[in-house]
């Protein structure tokens, strides 16, 4: 089986969020199942820098390939590299006008960029003369890939046997634009209707991916159910219910070779489940680095997030002073809404030896926080999958979560009677339940040392690898091919 993955960001070439981790890791494990995977992504400005840093070669494949379907004279060049330690080829769609911004999701026109990339990825496949059984597109930026394949390329013999899979990583980001972009995209006018791309008078790229792909997946079983409800459906719940028979939730995993406390070079001291006492050394070193009091008797709570409403930061705003009464330390890493950045800067000033606010994106510091923290806080309003809780489990850092989406699928409440469970959580989205859950975790840390040791070991034993998920994706690909045949 041959699979083409199309995504806007892929680790280690360009990373902004969890999408890059997923599309960087999934091909590796699918490849081990005997599937040949090829990845297509834009040649963002950061790609060259990252390849140079990693010693990865970039080869020129072709220049000035035209896009006859689009209303543009812009052409694209094609370059190639390889995902490290694999045989997975990565092809870069290069165009100086669309992909020369410093940041991945910036540029002259996000709608045009996504249209250009989606069509260019398809034309790149044709140029390479590589036929694919599956084209697997990710998120709204590639939502038009299934649309193109089911319309303008429907009778193209090159894609005659190609089935499509579309993955929703976060329904909150849909790519909604002025309908005038239909003309630029070269798409037929009849697609602008309620059963097509039309969405409250606009066009919706994500809706296109949902309606025109053979199979739709999202990133956890619970989230797949949630998004079919009005509460979580972001006005697409009706469309998703229409595709319910073809909608699957597959929990993401993490790359165990990349995230391994026993070998991770970015943390202070390596450790494993048999030498878990060394985890404390990471804690004291991080406390020193961040100018916190060096104390093992107080729990260190870490939080690494985009600083946006989705992540439950409005709850933290209201209870942080009460949290400090528990005698804890709190480390925050992330960027986002200015109001939250200012909030975290201000509480650091208020509690200088207890709180460290780091308003930046720093991969190395993130790894240190995962390894050094006793607990990891994720009180999300909604969370399609979440990777932070998986990294924390891998490093023996006990997650405190709101049970929603992938958090509900990966974190199980610790039960002192059965000594089963790997974390602590709450369901109702309010300050009282969050504060109660933090208090519970702090109590176990300070007063129930035996139970705390058990929940830490349970966390480290939790399987959050890609292996199980990769097998599920193989079944999905086979199902997509079966549907394509009808």
From Swiss-Prot:
**Catalyzed reactions:** [(1->4)-alpha-D-glucosyl](n) + ADP-alpha-D-glucose = [(1->4)-alpha-D-glucosyl](n+1) + ADP + H(+)
Q: A GO BP term, please?
A: glycogen biosynthetic process
Q: What is its EC number?
A: 2.4.1.21
Q: In which pathway is this protein known to take part? A: Glycan biosynthesis; glycogen biosynthesis
Family designation: Belongs to the glycosyltransferase 1 family. Bacterial/plant glycogen synthase subfamily.
Q: What does this protein do?
A: Synthesizes alpha-1,4-glucan chains using ADP-glucose.
Its protein name is Glycogen synthase
Q: Which organism is it from?
A: Pseudothermotoga lettingae (strain ATCC BAA-301 / DSM 14385 / NBRC 107922 / TMO)
